[in-house]
Amino acid sequence: MFDRPLKILFVSSEVVPFAKTGGLADVAGSLPKALATVVDHGLSHHDVRVAMPRYKMIEDARYVTDFPVWFADKNHEAIIRQREIEAQFQGARHTVPVYMIDNYQYYYRDGIYVFDDEAERFGFFCKAVLEMLPRLGWQPDVIHCNDWQCGPIPLFLKTHYRGDPFFSRMATVFTIHNLQYQGNFPKEVLHMLGLGKEYFRPEALEFYGSVSFMKAGIQYADVLTTVSRTYAREIQTPEYGQRMEGVLRQRAHELYGIVNGINYHEFDPKTDPRLHRNYDVDHWEHKKENKFTLQREMNLPVRDVPVLGLITRLVDQKGLDLIAEIIDELMRLDIQMVILGKGDKYYEDMFREMKVQHPGKIAAHIGFNVVLAQRIYAGSDMFLMPSRFEPCGLGQLISLRYGTIPIVRETGGLADTVNEYDLATGGGNGFVFKEYDARALYSAIARALKLYREDQEAWGRLVRNAMEMDFSWARSAVEYLQVYRDAMEKVSEERGIRIA
């Protein structure tokens, strides 16, 4: 069924390279390109387009059309502008159109979030995206909605547009990137959305006294996804469910976990221009030259000792309290640590103080620097991710690509992508600990250091295992295309419509 190229609209509140506050933008800038170019079931060249708001910082977007959108009891102007993102396929260049919803009142501001009228800004955005489609004369098979900002789209399709034949064949997929951010608003928002009080109930949009845009997506989308199989299971439990576990359990049979990918052209140690010495899986030993360069750059003694890298947002989620608990014990070992990140002042000050207390052992750059990040990925021997929770995780995917061995807690996407190295079989690609406990983290680090120091041949196998993993966007795209077909089939069966 559906043995033809698909028409896919990917909707996100932020998209690289136009607007970014977090990892969602990276996904929205990468996955559509992979979807447009991947060969799947012998098919390629799916018609993939992207929709996002046109924020103040986005320049040179060309005019396409404009129209009024009835929203919050009055007409608002929606201007559609367009940019493109480029994708490469078999040596040819392809473009993915990016439609930008422009409205001066809602989007001509400094920054993307967080404003007092978020419900109105993104409620309008979702309505305008749907109103745009008949103006373009384009009917996507699937609308892929991302996070709470896009939650009203499935809701609107099953309420305001339910009887409209233009929209009747469209399936929706809703992806939860981080359940912690839910878009919860006062119940008066229902009127703004054009919905009656009958939607203020637990079976619909009510969420502990609020109206939840995240819950709108979860309840009304045809199929749900999140960014790893383990996180899909975790969010159905009270520990990780952010009070949404009940509604997620009800839809467990339609909830898929698909690990995000990384751009294998951008993150390639063989060609990365930011590295002192390029290398590949057959010449991984050249990593050492990058280590020595990193040590010089970070004012650490240039010695062939294990270097542990840490690149992260400095927030509670990332397990930094575990590192703090064992740092003095770690520093008694013959190792070095290189830290890059910014975030909460408490953790920024903590790492500054560690650097002072352990000169020549710890280097910390508070802030973010893309070039330095790549040099840490390439120059470190091991990479720490002791996260409290991690829906998917990006750092471990990049570190694997660069042959830098991840030491991670078994949660979310970390559990799906990193497996404990087995000396007997030679399998595995990292070191893993289960309990959120500083001693468990220390034990995992100790296992990594023991192998590194005592068996370089085995360490070489481990590095090669890591570098040979495939976490490219092409792999993720194939999985998403199957989910899209599942959503289309569900719509076809439920509505009695044949979708060719």
UniProtKB/Swiss-Prot annotation:
EC annotation from Swiss-Prot or TrEMBL: 2.4.1.21
Leading EC class: transferase
Catalysed reaction, written as an equation: [(1->4)-alpha-D-glucosyl](n) + ADP-alpha-D-glucose = [(1->4)-alpha-D-glucosyl](n+1) + ADP + H(+)
NCBIfam families: glgA, PRK00654.1-2
Function: Synthesizes alpha-1,4-glucan chains using ADP-glucose.
Organism name: Desulforudis audaxviator (strain MP104C)
The protein's annotated pathway: Glycan biosynthesis; glycogen biosynthesis
GO BP: glycogen biosynthetic process
Positions bound to ADP-alpha-D-glucose: 20
GO molecular function terms attached to this record: alpha-1,4-glucan glucosyltransferase (ADP-glucose donor) activity; alpha-1,4-glucan glucosyltransferase (UDP-glucose donor) activity
Name the record gives this protein: Glycogen synthase
Keywords: Glycogen biosynthesis, Glycosyltransferase, Transferase
Sequence similarity: Belongs to the glycosyltransferase 1 family. Bacterial/plant glycogen synthase subfamily.
